A protein has these predicted regions:
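A short, Lys/Arg-rich alpha-helix, primarily the initiator
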Residues: 1-14, 106-114
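Conserved hydrophobic/aromatic packing and binding residues within compact polymer-binding modules
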Residues: 7, 21-22, 32-35
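Short alpha-helical "recognition helix" segments of helix-turn-helix
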Residues: 19-22, 51
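Recognition helix of helix-turn-helix/homeodomain-like DNA-binding domains
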Residues: 26-42, 50
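DNA major-groove recognition helix of helix-turn-helix/homeodomain DNA-binding modules
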Residues: 46-64
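Interfacial/linker helices and their anchor residues that mediate assembly or domain coupling
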Residues: 70-119
Length: 119
């Protein structure tokens, strides 16, 4: 599923028209249409956050929106992660170490559970 298809699906499930969503976001309906058709990709965090807010997405759905946006722009990192990664040397080191040692999904899940358990 593409970024635009995901937005369209969520918008329709909430019974919001394309024009209605565009108005709530303060953008032109033609721009919103281009986003849904995959002709344009709003990789600005603010717009993605506003889309998630207007569509009342869960945190998991919001994260999926970030990831789909990054996938549409090949080689991009999700806009919600870019600033964090670039401002945290340890995060960059951890990611590079995981890459170099080919960390498995199981290892990543164990790491996530360890972090959650410490909170």
């Amino acid at each position: 599923m593409t970024f635009g298809e995901y937005i369209e699906e969520k918008r329709k499930s909430k019974k919001i028209t394309l024009r209605g969503l565009a108005e709530k976001l303060g953008i032109a309906p033609s721009y919103m249409s281009d986003i849904e058709k995959g002709k344009r990709n709003p990789n600005r965090k603010e717009l993605i956050d506003n889309i998630a807010k207007v569509l009342n997405l869960t945190q998991e759905e919001h994260n999926e929106l970030y990831d789909l946006s990054a996938q549409q722009n090949e080689n991009d990192i999700s806009v919600d992660l870019t600033e964090y990664i670039m401002n945290d040397k340890v995060a960059r080191t951890a990611l590079r170490t995981a890459r170099d040692f080919n960390a498995t999904e199981e290892e990543w899940n164990a790491f996530i559970q360890t972090l959650k358990g410490n909170r």
